[in-house]
């Protein structure tokens, strides 16, 4: 049975409400999307040695659930779950789940992080049971949240999200299509944000093209990398660095 988008969105916004008091949208988006990412890759790949992403033993969402109520839950999520996932998949830094300035101190932090895990510990959000293997429900949810986070934070969507309509038009403007794209075709975005434009170009190509991007903000670059994985483009290369002073791609 496929997961209903309404159920997924409801859970995501419940997690936003849990975090909303201590930080603004530009900050809590990282926690929500990280939790979504860990839940998704755990359900999809934890028992798949040939999966698109490696989920180390002891670093699954189930291991997060086992930490609910633990006085050291924030520190343990950082060290025992997120760090192993980061190292195994060459990701950038995840948000700090033990940050007292954002999540509260002592029992407040434990309760906030525990409740965040509980929200995603829902049978309705079992991604391993999603019958539509090719359905982009996670990618759609990711972009849905990006749009709303931009609105909530009062910042331009362009900071970390290119609207789907704009991405689609730009992908068509450059003229890429199944007729002229091959498996040797490459696409590069020098200010890729969350990677939405790259993904639209890949979609327009109709082929397994090579995707590359560079993004100055480390957190946003990590969101782009996660976005690539959620959209079945795990081989995309995203560099976190300043394009103007240290361009990673010069050819």
Specify the residue positions occupied by each region the protein language model found:
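Conserved S-adenosyl-L-methionine
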Residues: 156-251
């Amino acid at each position: 049975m496929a997961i209903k988008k309404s159920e997924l969105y409801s859970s995501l916004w419940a997690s936003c409400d849990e975090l909303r008091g201590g930080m603004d949208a530009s900050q809590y988006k990282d926690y929500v999307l990280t939790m979504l990412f860990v839940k998704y890759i755990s359900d999809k790949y934890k028992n798949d040695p040939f999966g698109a992403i490696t989920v180390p033993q002891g670093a699954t969402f189930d291991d997060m659930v086992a930490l609910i109520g633990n006085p050291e839950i924030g520190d343990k999520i950082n060290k025992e779950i997120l760090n192993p996932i980061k190292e195994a998949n060459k990701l950038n830094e995840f948000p700090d789940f033990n940050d007292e300035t954002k999540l509260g101190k002592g029992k407040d932090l434990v309760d906030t992080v525990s409740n965040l895990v509980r929200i995603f510990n829902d049978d309705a959000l079992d991604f391993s049971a999603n019958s539509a293997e090719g359905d982009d429900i996670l990618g759609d949810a990711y972009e849905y949240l990006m749009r709303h986070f931009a609105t909530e934070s009062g910042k331009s969507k362009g900071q970390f999200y290119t609207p789907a309509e704009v991405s689609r038009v730009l992908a068509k403007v450059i003229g890429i299509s199944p007729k002229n794209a091959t498996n040797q075709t490459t696409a590069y975005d020098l200010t890729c944000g969350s990677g939405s434009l790259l993904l639209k170009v890949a979609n327009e190509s109709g082929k397994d093209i090579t995707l590359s991007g560079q993004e100055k903000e480390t957190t946003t670059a990590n969101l782009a990398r996660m976005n690539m994985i959620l959209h079945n483009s795990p081989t995309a290369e995203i560099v976190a660095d300043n394009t103007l002073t240290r361009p990673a791609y010069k050819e």
